[in-house]
């Protein structure tokens, strides 16, 4: 499974790289803090497969990188190969500002 660090992702976003973000956390978590992208809670992924492109990089993120790892494993089982996990999730992202 491909991984990306918070710093690497921040640099990609700042350089306007073609990347899609998917936040798989629950709505209440997203309301507290997010870095944008689509919001598809992990439990709803099966109903939203058609919204996930297969022709560009897609970075999945959650709070710590654990749920997004599991989500990527499930999506890879459904044929997706372009998925990247935000290592450490939002916790790692927030630590960039500290």
Regions found by a protein language model. Give the residues of each.
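Rhodanese-like catalytic fold shared by cysteine-dependent sulfurtransferases
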Residues: 1-20, 24-59, 64-98
């Amino acid at each position: 499974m491909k991984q990306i660090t918070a710093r690497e992702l921040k640099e990609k976003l700042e350089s306007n790289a073609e990347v899609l973000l998917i936040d798989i956390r629950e709505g209440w978590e997203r309301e507290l803090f997010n870095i944008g992208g689509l919001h598809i809670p992990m439990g709803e992924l099966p109903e939203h497969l058609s919204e996930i492109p297969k022709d560009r990089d897609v970075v999945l993120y959650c709070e710590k990188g654990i749920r997004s790892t599991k989500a990527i494993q499930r999506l890879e089982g459904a044929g997706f190969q372009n998925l990247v996990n935000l290592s450490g999730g939002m916790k790692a992202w927030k630590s960039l500002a500290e």
